[in-house]
Amino acid sequence: MIGIGICLLAALCTSCRQELIEYGQGDLRISIEKGDAYLHDFPLFLGISKKNAPQMAVWTEDMQGNFLSTIYVTHKIATQSWTASGGNRRKEALPCWCHVRSVRYDDGLYLPTKAEPLTDGVSGATPREDFDVKITPKEGLKRFVVKIEINHSTDFNEFYPASAREGDTNYSGGKMGSGQPAVVYAATVDL
């Protein structure tokens, strides 16, 4: 019985270990640094809120704007594991990444489903602190663009209010939607 307990404890401890990312020649490191507004107040109930990190996707495109590959995407959008979404798949969360992938699902939307999630190889928990993403360019790829799309839930303002209704030009998913649109950053890589 003690042996089983020790094995279980050892398994639990090793599963919590963070893997170190090793970089080789030709690998690129993208660093995401947490700023003052990185964690956002997400309303829960009765005026209680929690600090929420943004949803994000990192991908590469060729110089003509054609999608090459997803490097990283946050777990919630990759697996549709939203908290209290009521079935809303949050198509407004990362619209640029969703559309550039050109993967259309049975319901007509361009974002992964619970039945067809993205692989663990490109998805991960939403980081709450600074973090790095590793890119290993394909053999012979010398010039390409790295894009990062970032979006906060419930980031409403006077132009994108929570009160906007479906069909309004400024509708962004309702009271638990995005509010302001996602932001996309791009950098050209020339090896």
Residue ranges of each PLM-predicted region?
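Bacterial N-terminal signal peptides that target proteins for export
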Residues: 1-2, 58
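Sec-dependent N-terminal signal peptides
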Residues: 2-10
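C-terminal motif of bacterial Sec signal peptides marking the signal peptidase cleavage site
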Residues: 12-15
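Bacterial signal peptide processing site
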Residues: 17-19
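Exposed beta-strand and adjacent loop surfaces of beta-rich binding modules
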Residues: 27, 53-57, 143-145
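Short amphipathic, basic-aromatic surface patches that mediate peripheral association
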Residues: 30-51, 76
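Structured domain cores in non-transmembrane regions
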Residues: 50, 61-163
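Short beta-strand elements
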Residues: 161-191
